[in-house]
């Protein structure tokens, strides 16, 4: 239950006290389905078997056929990025970036330094936008009870805020509380409607809830700032227009006024990340220590991101690598990537490398013992691997990346966590915050590399036949495109996206996917309100929307709830 509203949390500077309530438990058993858990790339269905109050098995089903690979066949390779970028309106830049890299790899094109810097700044702005939106607007309400915030003592909340982050921008908590009260009094809760409150799994005090709710409202402004950063060199947001195979088209936007505008927005966003976002992530880690031991996986993979020169992967600011069984970071060999379809709605059951991948849909029926997803099951050397911010941060951490190591070690000390506890639901969210901090700092230096009037395009010519791939890190994780050019047009195009890695089904060897294995062991206090399951699912950032239906097959009842 929430702690006393009179607590001021000043005993230890910058560190909230541990929660006084134990995590809730239950003894329930049975099969439950969350369907749909919606996301930008389609609809997600999660089925779990609960035994004695814990998830014993889980099945993740992608419920929407994508088919863009079939759309791209016989088209001009130079146009592919305009199609692929429209796959997602949140990760609005990443598929375009990966597609041009893919064609450039096939045609052996090296882009000018100025173009590379612009692309890094666009990608950086994408990360800042997505991570802030995810933490506050897609994931925080799994931990924060808005109704409890209405009971908070405003003065105590100010004291708490100052103890956690003395340099944070001043926030009028009384006004924020009044705005929340207006929502409640109107009877039209909007995004806060239909949530699980009150629920025994929510452990924050009213003051902590008000603090994070106020930051939720403040973050709405910040996501607009980072979207504006995208538009300065990208032309617009969503879906930038300044990309092209061989470079970028925004040569005349690289001027003092534009650079200064970008820098001002970056500095405002960076201050929020360092003084609000990261301390809030530490607050949740302290308030929910049991979640540092839940929701983890064993294997991580990162393609790396932010090239600093033509030398890749050596020059990648976030390094490339793979971690198996939580060991050291090893070199990545993309030839060891295969996609399995034994449990997916596609013809056959042969595992293939993406370069020779086949998209041949064949829907049968949803049967968790057979085929149950439109997602394929990517594997690295036959093993499922998690991709995303945790993978990027841990690969960099184990490679001794100085900025990442300093950020992680500082957070672990503040949150009273160990490095191994990063492999968890709470660690996944922490990694996202720390990565945002590191990227924001690096972007300030990249701005100084821009050359007004400098070259932004490398001329090139189309080959009659070529093959290539483009590797990218989207905010959600490793993203790869593979192309086969035949007679100057696209003969075959394959995408392996982060959500496929993380939410894919079992493979040929019947090994569960990352989310399927991460959910095992999750305690569920009330299966009709499965906030604990959603905490781990949301921590992988599947862009949750609207309504969730939880079905109890024993009673044939449907419980309508909201995933905020």
Features from the language model and the residues they span:
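Mixed-charge (Asp/Glu-Lys/Arg
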Residues: 488
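Active-site bordering "gate/hinge" segments
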Residues: 2-476, 497-564
């Amino acid at each position: 239950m929430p702690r006393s509203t009179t607590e001021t949390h000043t005993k230890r500077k910058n560190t909230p006290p541990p929660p006084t309530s134990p995590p809730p438990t239950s003894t329930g058993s049975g099969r439950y389905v969350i369907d749909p858990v919606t996301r930008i790339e389609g609809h997600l269905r999660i089925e779990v078997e609960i035994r004695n109050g814990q998830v014993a098995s889980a099945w993740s089903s992608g419920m929407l056929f994508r088919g863009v690979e079939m759309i791209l066949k016989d088209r001009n390779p130079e146009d592919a990025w305009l199609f692929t970028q429209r796959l997602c309106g949140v990760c609005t830049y990443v598929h375009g970036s990966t597609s041009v890299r893919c064609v450039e790899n096939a045609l052996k094109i090296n882009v000018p330094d100025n173009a590379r810097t612009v692309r890094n700044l666009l990608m950086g702005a994408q990360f800042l936008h997505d991570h802030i939106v995810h933490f506050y607007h897609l994931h925080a309400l799994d931990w924060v009870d808005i109704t409890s915030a209405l009971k908070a003592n405003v003065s105590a909340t100010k004291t708490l805020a100052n103890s956690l982050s003395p340099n944070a921008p001043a926030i009028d908590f009384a006004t924020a509380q009044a705005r929340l009260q207006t929502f409640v009094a109107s009877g039209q809760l909007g995004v806060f409607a239909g949530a699980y409150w009150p629920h025994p799994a929510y452990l924050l005090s009213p003051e902590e809830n008000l603090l994070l709710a106020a930051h939720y409202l403040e973050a709405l402004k910040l996501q607009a700032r980072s979207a504006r950063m995208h538009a300065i060199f990208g032309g617009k947001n969503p879906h930038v227009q300044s990309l092209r195979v061989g470079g970028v088209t925004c040569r005349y936007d690289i001027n003092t006024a534009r650079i200064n505008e970008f820098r001002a927005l970056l500095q405002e966003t960076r201050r929020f990340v360092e003084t609000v976002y990261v301390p809030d992530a530490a607050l949740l880690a302290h308030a929910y220590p049991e979640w540092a031991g839940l929701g983890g996986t064993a294997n991580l993979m990162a393609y790396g991101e932010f090239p600093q020169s033509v030398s890749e992967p050596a020059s990648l600011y976030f390094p490339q690598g793979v971690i198996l069984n939580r060991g050291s970071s090893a070199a990545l060999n993309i030839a060891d990537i295969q996609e399995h379809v034994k449990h997916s709605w596609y013809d056959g059951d042969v595992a293939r490398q993406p370069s020779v991948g086949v998209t041949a849909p064949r829907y049968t029926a949803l049967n968790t013992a057979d085929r149950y997803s439109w997602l394929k099951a990517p594997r690295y050397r036959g093993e499922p691997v998690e991709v995303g911010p945790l993978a990027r941060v841990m690969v960099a951490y184990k490679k001794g990346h100085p900025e990442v190591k300093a950020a992680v070690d500082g957070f672990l000390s503040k949150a009273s966590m160990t490095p191994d506890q990063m492999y968890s639901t709470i660690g996944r969210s922490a990694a996202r915050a720390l990565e945002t901090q590191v990227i924001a700092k690096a972007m300030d230096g990249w701005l100084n590399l821009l050359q007004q009037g400098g070259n932004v395009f490398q001329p090139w010519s189309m080959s009659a036949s070529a093959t290539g791939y483009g590797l990218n890190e989207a905010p959600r994780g490793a993203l790869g495109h593979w192309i086969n050019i035949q007679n100057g047009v696209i003969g075959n195009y394959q995408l392996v996206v982060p959500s496929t890695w993380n939410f894919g089904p079992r493979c040929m060897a019947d090994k569960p996917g990352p989310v399927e294995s991460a959910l095992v062991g999750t305690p569920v206090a009330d299966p009709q309100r499965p906030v604990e399951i959603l905490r781990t699912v949301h921590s992988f950032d599947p862009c949750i929307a609207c309504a969730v239906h939880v079905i109890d097959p024993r009673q044939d009842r449907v419980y309508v709830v909201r995933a905020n």
